[in-house]
Amino acid sequence: MLQAILDFYHSTGFYGLNMGSIIMMLVACVFLYLAIAKEFEPLLLVPISFGILLTNLPFAGMMAEPLLEVHEKLSASGAHLYTAHTAEPGGLLYYLFQGDHLGIFPPLIFLGVGAMTDFGPLISNPKSLLLGAAAQFGIFVTFFGAIASGLFTAQEAASIGIIGGADGPTAIFLSSKLAPHLMGPIAVAAYSYMALVPIIQPPIMTALTSETERKIKMSQLRLVSKREKIIFPIVVTILVSLIVPPAATLVGMLMLGNLFRECGVVGRLEDTAKNALINIITIFLGVTVGATATAEAFLKVETLAILGLGIVAFGIGTGSGVLLAKFMNKLSKEPINPLLGSAGVSAVPMAARVSQVVGQKADPTNFLLMHAMGPNVAGVIGSAVSAGVLLSLFG
């Protein structure tokens, strides 16, 4: 009887608990609290944090790889033949994770984002493209910083640097190509910092701007014709794909989704891309990204370095956008609110909303949201192009 009780205990998760898994489960619970109680981007943090919880449950085997049996036999000619079959299937999340590993989910997310995005503010004010480009500066500064640390190779440093674009799908796509073994920490860092945009950005924005600058009101954007909105995704796809071919996957899917939105003749495809498809992929992507956050993968020096470099990249991207906007404001005949520069990171629409909130704290009658969407959507294109550049250099 005692042996039966011991055998049962050894089969439970309590027997397999260790300090590492307990720490990671506590981290998951903190993320769940932030997502549910504080509403910090719950669409991202709820599936990610639950994935962290699932993967750190002892003996659950959610990310277990399939067990293969290999058999050897001789052919009639005497040659050695090998056959393999699955002796035991892998865990559910292992199979879903192949969408991350093979680079399938990120482009599909971009398809949905394109279907939801109005590029009108960018087309109306092309100068905002510069702010989106400036915000990518953090990617390359952090790339060199990661190499200088001596902890990472060039491929790993490129994958870490892309966190500065504040674009989770792009970070997953690039790291799956250049540093698959670091995809988990990089993806969790990228999505976590995206969710924490309302906390990370405002102190940087207020530190780099005066109250007078934050009160600057922008002139009304011009109306953009339907023809312009249809031509835009086609032209961008052609130009970006010719200049940076590795960026074609992400930019092409982004612009296809946007063409669904703007052409007006494929309403069903637009609706599916921006609702059902992106919601399903967000669930799969979030849970599987979280499931890579095992105690063995996360509780080590390299992971802490990735988290530290990631937030530095994000901060530099935010700051460089604000500083360029201040510089442009000096040269431009029309006033430019420097708060728009921080929206150049590609966390859509969180970064644009932060610009609006910080601006309204200085002047409640100031409405910056639509103006901030210009650099915000430019940042989406910019992060995809940056990923393409890094992939062409180190892929």
Swiss-Prot record:
The entry's keywords: Cell membrane, Ion transport, Membrane, Sodium, Sodium transport, Translocase, Transmembrane, Transmembrane helix, Transport
Pfam families recorded: OAD_beta
PTM remark: The N-terminus is blocked.
Reaction equation(s) it catalyzes: (S)-methylmalonyl-CoA + Na(+)(in) + H(+)(out) = propanoyl-CoA + Na(+)(out) + CO2
Single GO biological process annotation from the record: sodium ion transport
Annotated transmembrane regions: 17-37, 43-63, 103-123, 128-148, 180-200, 230-250, 278-298, 304-324, 374-394
Cysteines engaged in disulfide bonds, as pairs: none
Lipid bilayer topology: Multi-pass membrane protein
Enzyme Commission identifier(s): 7.2.4.3
Subcellular location: Cell membrane
GO molecular function: lyase activity
Function noted in UniProt: Tunnel subunit of the sodium ion pump methylmalonyl-CoA decarboxylase, which converts the chemical energy of a decarboxylation reaction into an electrochemical gradient of Na(+) ions across the cytoplasmic membrane, thereby creating a sodium ion motive force that is used for ATP synthesis. The beta subunit catalyzes the decarboxylation of the carboxybiotin carrier protein and the coupled export of Na(+) ions.
Subunit structure: The methylmalonyl-CoA decarboxylase is composed of four subunits: the carboxyltransferase alpha subunit (MmdA), the tunnel beta subunit (MmdB), the biotin-containing gamma subunit (MmdC) and the delta subunit (MmdD).
Name of this chain's protein: Methylmalonyl-CoA decarboxylase subunit beta
Organism: Propionigenium modestum
Lineage: Bacteria, Fusobacteriati, Fusobacteriota, Fusobacteriia, Fusobacteriales
